């Protein structure tokens, strides 16, 4: 089954998806929406579920904390609220697991990868959330591949 990762912000959400074996993470979309319109994000997730024939069994949500001490910040509470929305949205889908994955440094890693690939700054801005979702998903997959 596939895993879907989200790098959620207030106006954009990066999406990444795994292959059926849960080994390879690929960037899927950099979804832009009205500020804090999380119903649009839920609708996008539903669209992805349909496009992938409901082969997704896990949603991996990037979990932001303070870089140095791991304490919660404003974005952490935003993600926790969205997590509750996701749980409610998928209440009748027992097969879908929703999990957090530490996203500290994911944007830096994604940006550095893009720079190393000679991607121009304007393009980096357009795809960095999607690539951050890839980093988040890779982290999750590396820890959970045999579970």
From Swiss-Prot:
* Keywords for the protein's UniProt record, in alphabetical order: Cytoplasm, Hydrolase, Nuclease, Ribosome biogenesis
Extract the Pfam families matched here.
Answer: RuvX
Gene3D superfamilies the UniProt entry points to: YqgF/RNase H-like domain (3.30.420.140)
Q: Could you confirm whether the keyword Cytoplasm appears in this record? A: yes
For biological process, the GO terms are: rRNA 5'-end processing
Q: Which residues form a coiled coil?
A: none
Please indicate which superkingdom the organism of origin belongs to: Bacteria
- InterPro entries (alphabetical): RNaseH-like_sf, YqgF, YqgF/RNaseH-like_dom, YqgF/RNaseH-like_dom_sf
Quick check: keyword Disulfide bond in the entry?
no
Localization of this protein = Cytoplasm
Question: Can you name a GO cellular component term?
Answer: cytosol
By its UniProt entry, which SMART domains does this protein fall under? Answer: YqgFc (SM00732)
Q: What is its EC number?
A: 3.1.-.-
Main location as per UniProt? cytoplasm
State any single GO MF term.
Answer: nuclease activity
The entry's function note states: Could be a nuclease involved in processing of the 5'-end of pre-16S rRNA.
Q: Would you identify the family this protein belongs to, as annotated?
A: Belongs to the YqgF nuclease family.
- This one is known as Putative pre-16S rRNA nuclease
Native organism is: Ureaplasma parvum serovar 3 (strain ATCC 700970)
Q: What is the lineage of its organism?
A: Bacteria, Bacillati, Mycoplasmatota, Mycoplasmoidales, Mycoplasmoidaceae
